[in-house]
């Protein structure tokens, strides 16, 4: 399972108001014998035109509060474990998901970076072979060292290790051309 309740405590949740999707306040993930505990930094919704596509929660290991620019910089810097959880509010076909990620990488990387990243982008978008159904989740984890672990509808995919890939992937939600309200994704760190 993607979420583990901490021993001896009831799992607290927070709700993204637009989609009414609930997310745990903390998540724990173990990789290579290291346990990472991450705290929610904010919630928002991904909309395409007028349609709600998914509720999204972002988590970070030992997040630091501060000004928006500093918080975003810390999130886009390798070193601490981070997680994005998307809980879908509607069905979306695989080709639309692949296209959205391909566009997201092109929007957030330079042409030179894309030359290096394209094989990894192809590998990543190859993970999306089936239509996503309402209430399914995509979980993306960025572990120290530029390690990306993707879980698509409960199935963990092969790891991609590239600090540049990780930064550009996270920039889809946290970069200057964010596809969501990135301030909402860090509101627990900037208030």
Task: Describe each region flagged by the PLM.
Residues 183-191:
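Cysteine/selenocysteine-centered motifs that mediate thiol-based redox chemistry or coordinate metal-sulfur cofactors
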Residues 63-143:
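Mid-length scaffold segments of soluble, non-membrane domains
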Residues 156-182:
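Flexible glycine-rich active-site/ligand-binding loops centered on an Asp-His dyad
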Residues 151-155:
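Short strand-turn-strand beta-turns centered on an Asx-Gly dipeptide
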Residues 39, 57, 85-87, 149:
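Soluble periplasmic/extracytoplasmic beta-strand elements of cell-envelope proteins
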Residues 6-10:
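Sec/Tat signal peptide C-region and signal peptidase I cleavage site
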Residues 1-5:
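Bacterial N-terminal signal peptides
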Residues 12-77:
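N-terminal structural module
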């Amino acid at each position: 399972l993607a979420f583990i309740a901490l021993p001896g405590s009831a799992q607290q949740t927070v709700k993204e108001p637009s989609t009414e999707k609930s997310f745990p306040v903390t998540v724990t993930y173990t990789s290579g014998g290291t346990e990472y505990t991450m705290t929610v930094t904010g919630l928002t919704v991904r909309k395409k035109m007028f349609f709600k596509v998914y509720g999204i929660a972002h988590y970070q290991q030992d997040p630091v509060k501060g000004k928006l620019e500093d918080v975003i910089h810390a999130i886009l810097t390798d070193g601490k474990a981070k997680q994005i959880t998307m809980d879908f509010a509607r069905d979306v076909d695989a080709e639309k998901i692949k296209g959205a990620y391909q566009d997201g990488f092109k929007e957030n990387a330079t042409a030179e970076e894309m030359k290096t990243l394209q094989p990894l982008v192809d590998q990543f978008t190859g993970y999306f072979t089936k239509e996503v159904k309402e209430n399914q989740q995509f979980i993306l984890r960025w572990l120290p060292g530029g390690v990306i672990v993707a879980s698509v509808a409960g199935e963990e995919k092969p790891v991609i290790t590239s600090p540049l890939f990780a930064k550009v992937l996270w920039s889809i939600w946290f970069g200057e051309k964010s596809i969501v309200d990135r301030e909402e994704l860090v509101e627990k760190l900037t208030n």
